[in-house]
Amino acid sequence: MNRRSKWLWIEPITGSRKRSNFFWACILFLGSLGFFLVGISSYFGENLIPLLSSQQILFVPQGIVMCFYGIAGLFISSYLWCTILFNVGSGYNKFDKKKGIVCLFRWGFPGINRRIFSRFLMKDIQMIKTEIQEGISPRRVLYMEIKGRQDIPLTRTGDNVNLREIEQKAAESARFLRVSIEGF
């Protein structure tokens, strides 16, 4: 939901709370938990999970390896769940024509740098850039070029945005900021 008026444009940014992240976090958690429980079952010699038979699996070396992969998967799954819980990457882009200021805000992991906030003047914005790479894994990203700074992405690099949407967003941003568009 974009909030836009003649002088102010606030664009919310979706963070890590996406359906795909929930899906992969669940799949990874269940799979790694299964690996870990089968490895532990092979150690005790009993089936802890009725559906997964561990009678033919020796603890050394298969059970140890399954426990290791299960623990590694649980750590990766907990990382994914933490990014979802803290909504890492979410925030907003705020363009204020009256004050001539652009503010970019994102949430990070807890700690000193939990709030990531960038502020700069609109007159320092040189252009809006679009990076479009087609192929097996297409990449379509919208950047804002600012004097004396590196290009700042306005869209997430992992989002699968179609070509029409990225072009419309680039045109809308350039029109509001009154800058040119460059594609590469």
Curated annotation (Swiss-Prot):
One of its GO terms (cellular component) is chloroplast thylakoid membrane. It is found in: Plastid, Chloroplast thylakoid membrane. Keywords: Chloroplast, Membrane, Photosynthesis, Plastid, Thylakoid, Transmembrane, Transmembrane helix. The keyword Cytoplasm does not apply. The chain crosses the membrane at residues 21-43, 58-78. The keyword Transcription regulation does not apply. It is a multi-pass membrane protein. It comes from the Eukaryota. One of its GO terms (biological process) is photosynthesis. Seems to be required for the assembly of the photosystem I complex. HAMAP family: Ycf4. Belongs to the Ycf4 family. This is Photosystem I assembly protein Ycf4. The lineage of its organism: Eukaryota, Viridiplantae, Streptophyta, Embryophyta, Tracheophyta.
